[in-house]
């Protein structure tokens, strides 16, 4: 495909189904469900909050990262990935589509396993570029790049432990 085009309605529906499964699996911490909706390799650009880009992360590594106790696997962390109704879709090849989605992601971390006391809140507002790939006839979640425009509360502290384990150190040097 030489020039990106608008995908057909059925392909958009397939991508929306993958997007829904991705968001729900994150929020319910259902890692088997996540495994069913992802592509064999993913582009994960978490520079917005982990300062890390994985150009081609194998699905098993992605599942390990997502379910890590320092990341979304922490049972004291509750999330809600809201995807806005205003989305843009571009078909970049026969088996690849890029979606641009409005996002709000709420995070709440609890002080105890009984989830009785909120220790930290942090919500991110913005958009996400999400890549989809058709694998054996089914559209799959193939990567994400969040774009955080603004945040509420202590969003920068939600994944502090995850940034230490999974991310890259921040550099004050100019990359000019």
Curated annotation (Swiss-Prot):
The active site is at 81, 107. Gene3D superfamilies: 3.10.450.50. GO terms for molecular function: scytalone dehydratase activity. InterPro entries: NTF2-like_dom_sf, Scytalone_dehydratase, Scytalone_dh. Secalonic acids show unprecedented anticancer activities against various human cancer cells and might be interesting for further derivatization, targeting diseases such as cancer. GO terms for biological process: melanin metabolic process. Its EC number is 4.2.1.-. Signal peptide: none annotated. SUPFAM superfamilies: NTF2-like. Keywords: Lyase. Pathway: Secondary metabolite biosynthesis. Substrate binds at residues 26, 46. Scytalone dehydratase-like protein; part of the gene cluster that mediates the biosynthesis of the tetrahydroxanthone dimer secalonic acid D. The pathway begins with the synthesis of atrochrysone thioester by the polyketide synthase AacuL. The atrochrysone carboxyl ACP thioesterase AacuM then breaks the thioester bond and releases the atrochrysone carboxylic acid from AacuL. Atrochrysone carboxylic acid is decarboxylated by the decarboxylase AacuI, and oxidized by the anthrone oxygenase AacuG to yield emodin. Emodin is then reduced to emodin hydroquinone by a yet unidentified oxidoreductase. Belongs to the scytalone dehydratase family. This is Scytalone dehydratase-like protein AacuK. The lineage of its organism: Eukaryota, Fungi, Dikarya, Ascomycota, Pezizomycotina.
């Amino acid at each position: 495909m030489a020039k990106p085009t608008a995908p057909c309605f059925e392909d958009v529906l397939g991508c929306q189904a993958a997007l829904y499964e991705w968001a729900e699996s994150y929020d319910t911490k259902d890692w088997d469900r996540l495994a069913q909706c992802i592509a064999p390799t993913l582009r994960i650009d978490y520079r917005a909050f982990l300062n890390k880009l994985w150009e081609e992360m194998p699905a098993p590594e992605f599942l390990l990262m997502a379910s890590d106790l320092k990341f979304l696997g922490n049972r004291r962390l509750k999330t809600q990935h809201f995807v806005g109704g205003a989305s843009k879709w571009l078909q970049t090849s026969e088996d690849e589509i890029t979606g641009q989605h409005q996002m709000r992601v709420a995070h709440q971390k609890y002080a105890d396993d009984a989830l009785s006391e909120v220790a930290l809140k942090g919500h991110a507002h913005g958009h996400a570029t999400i890549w989809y790939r058709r694998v054996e006839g089914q559209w799959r979640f193939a990567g994400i790049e969040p774009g955080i425009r603004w945040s509420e509360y202590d969003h920068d502290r939600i994944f502090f432990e995850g940034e230490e384990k999974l991310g890259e150190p921040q550099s004050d040097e100019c990359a000019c």
